[in-house]
Design a protein with these regions (language model features):
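Conserved flavin/dinucleotide-binding core of flavoenzymes
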Residues: 29, 72, 137-139, 414, ...
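N-terminal Rossmann-like FAD-binding beta1-loop-alpha1 element of flavoenzymes
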Residues: 28-57
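N-terminal mitochondrial targeting presequence
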Residues: 1-28, 633
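Mid-domain catalytic core of redox enzymes
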Residues: 49, 292, 316-477, 622-633
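Glycine-rich FAD pyrophosphate-binding loop
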Residues: 47-74
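Active-site/ligand-binding neighborhood in enzyme catalytic cores
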Residues: 166, 170-321, 330
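Dinucleotide-binding Rossmann-like beta1-alpha1 core, especially the glycine-rich loop
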Residues: 76-179
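Conserved Rossmann-like nucleotide-cofactor binding loop
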Residues: 38, 63, 354
Length: 633
């Protein structure tokens, strides 16, 4: 399949894609605490800074990659790939651009498998309600415009799941907006959706979506954090606001994405080569992407790149006992393990907030490192510790992977289905959250190479070819259970492997009529895997960031899925922000996006040069802006 042509203005050798100016800084060293995707990204980004002369990456377990864990399993006739964490990465520009650039830089450009928008995994997504699968209204490419409209209207009037949606949308504008005093006050997703639409939409539709992303309870999750752009439209009416945004081609852009793009130096921009441009064009035709060996292939490649850099000391199974700092401009950060204590100019902490709270709460005098003659007297950062204690809630999920040799096992094709909280216990005694049809998202297209189609140097066309994780036909399913339903569970309450597989098979038989027995089964209990952004989350992050900056003289940086997004793309962006602005880079004073000097990043609409993003949680004080889509970001 040919990849669309690329505008000449973006080809290599033309005007640089972006000009950025870095502040002049002295040489420095950094400790990165946590070897998940955020920490690996931060360490990789730091290796590109000539001023950063030493990086130490601490990871408490024996492996790197965090929740991104894949397993290749031999089966009769070939192999299949099971995922225990994220199984695909969402394609959404400009955020996904950073992932592509990093993957290209570490040698994965020919390994990326894109799930195309025309595939069933992109087109067909289901919700189980009340006792069958309901396809969410989405246009089908093979059908004409009128047939698609007819099908979607039919679903809205016939399906009990969707019936409350149309009147809720049509009459939403008649609901009173928040009072002026309430605009700064957060609320739960359940409260917001019920108030603006109706409780059925919250219970049947939105709760299912939040089960799929957060395994969370919409009575607790923050509306402003997770549905902010939608909530901000209620003064004019949400449906009207959506129509006007579509009419004016206005989109929401995260300001942090603009800052990540703006940081890239001249050498990095020139690295935006033909391969990367072709990958981006292919990505624009896709909905998600992954790798032949699963998503773990990305952190594995990052770890290899860190080892090759010669600047990174990777310490797995590191027993960190304390992170401390004696206030003062010239006082370093100290990381104490059972083996030694090292001083650093900056520490980037990407571990869970509760784990960080424990490390900051330990006085260096009480640790067991052998260097007893050089103990550091440091006052405990009580304000930071108190703020961190409010970040204490994450859900636990049981992930069950199943493989069946029968390729025609499923009654439908698609990405999978989610289960809303309105499903009674009799239909969902396993506390199921959803089922992923893994086979459907395990194949797609990858970049195949280019060929000349004309006499000029730039006259060539890239092509793609089919690609797949699995080398054998069959059906691969992932069943997710637990989440907020298991908040009250004790460790002894969680199911073991045999019980989890039995529960998963029982659920599949009830929902899909599958009675066949899987030939391969794997399960993994992911304890405290998904941090919950509960009501007031944004305010807590803001206050925590201020406190950390003050207590640690802007030398401690916080990043990871406890703060600014739980997705892989969110974590990669936080790693990039932490390794640049978090350690002292200044937002560039001149920014140009693309060959047109009139097209500038969203952050340039604000007084960005005054933003001090060093230390704490490095994120722009303005979170989201609206821009017309024809503005290059």
């Amino acid at each position: 399949m040919p990849v669309p042509c690329i505008p000449n203005g973006l080809r290599v050798g033309r005007q640089p894609f972006l000009t950025a100016i870095r502040s002049q800084r002295r040489a420095y060293n950094v400790a990165v605490v946590g070897g998940g995707i955020t920490g690996l990204t931060a360490a990789w980004k730091l290796t590109q800074d000539s001023k950063c002369n030493e990086i130490t990456l601490y990871e408490k377990s024996h492996r790197l990659g965090g929740w991104m864990e894949s397993e290749t399993i031999p089966v009769d006739g070939g192999k299949v790939v099971f995922e225990y964490g994220p199984r695909t990465l969402r394609w959404s520009r400009p955020a996904a651009q950073s992932i592509l650039e990093m993957a290209n830089a570490i040698g994965l450009s020919d390994q990326i498998i894109f799930t195309m928008k025309t595939q069933s995994a992109a087109l067909n997504r289901y919700i189980y309600y009340p006792d069958h699968l309901v396809r969410l209204p989405t246009p089908t490419p093979e059908l004409g415009f009128l047939q698609n409209i007819s099908n979607m209207i039919g679903s809205l009037f016939q399906e009990p799941l969707l019936k409350p949606l149309l009147p809720a949308l049509l009459f939403e504008h008649t609901k009173p907006a928040r009072m002026p005093d309430d605009w700064q006050r957060d609320e739960s997703i359940s409260s917001f959706i019920s108030r603006r639409f109706n409780p059925q939409v919250a219970d049947n539709l939105v709760s299912a979506m939040m089960h799929g992303i957060y395994a969370g309870d919409i009575d607790k999750l923050s509306a402003q954090t997770l549905l902010g752009p939608l909530r901000n439209m209620e003064d004019t009416g949400i449906l009207y606001g959506m129509i006007m945004k579509a009419w004016t081609r206005t989109q929401n852009f995260m300001v942090d994405d603009s800052l990540v793009a703006a940081e890239k130096d001249q050498n990095g921009i020139e690295g935006f080569n033909e391969t990367l441009i072709a990958l981006t064009a292919l990505g624009d035709q896709s909905s998600t992407f992954t790798f032949p060996g699963g998503t773990q292939q990305l952190p594995d490649a990052l770890a290899s790149a860190l080892k090759k850099s010669g600047k990174v000391n990777i310490r797995t199974e590191a027993d960190i006992q304390a992170i401390s700092h004696q206030p003062g401009d010239y006082s370093p950060m100290n990381v104490t393990t059972s083996e030694d204590r090292k001083a650093y100019d900056h520490v980037i902490a990407t571990i869970p907030a509760p784990a960080l709270t424990k490390l900051l709460s330990v006085s260096p005098k009480s640790t067991n490192h052998p260097d007893n003659g050089n103990r550091v007297s440091a006052k405990l950062p009580s304000d930071t510790i108190q703020q961190l204690k409010s970040f204490n809630y994450a859900t636990t999920a049981m992930v069950v992977n199943l493989y069946y040799p029968d390729p025609d096992l499923l009654p439908v094709k698609g990405f999978g289905y989610l289960i809303p909280r309105s499903i009674p216990a009799s239909e969902n005694p396993e506390c199921g959250l959803g089922v992923i049809f893994g086979t459907e998202s395990a194949y797609g297209s990858k970049l195949a190479g280019s060929k000349h189609v004309g006499p000029g140097e730039d006259d060539h066309q890239w092509a793609s070819e089919p690609a797949s994780q699995d080398t054998v036909d069959g059906t691969k399913l992932t069943v997710m259970m637990g989440g907020h339903y298991w908040d009250h569970y004790k460790p002894s309450d969680y199911p073991d492997h045999e019980t989890a597989v039995r529960m998963a098979c029982s659920m599949l038989e009830r929902h899909l009529g599958i009675t066949a027995k899987p030939t391969v089964t794997r399960s993994r209990l992911q304890r405290d895997a998904i941090p919950q952004y509960t009501v007031g989350h944004l305010d807590r992050v803001y206050e925590l960031s201020k406190t950390v900056k003050r207590d640690f003289d802007q030398k401690l940086v916080l990043a990871g899925n406890w703060y600014n997004g739980v997705g892989v793309g969110d974590c990669i962006k936080q790693g990039l922000m932490a390794a640049t602005y978090g350690v002292g880079f200044k937002p560039p004073s001149r920014v140009q996006l693309g060959p047109d000097p009139r097209k500038r990043g969203p952050h340039t609409a604000f007084d960005y040069e005054s933003w001090d993003l060093q230390g704490g949680v490095p994120t722009a004080p303005v979170r989201i802006v609206e821009l017309q889509a024809d503005r290059d970001t």
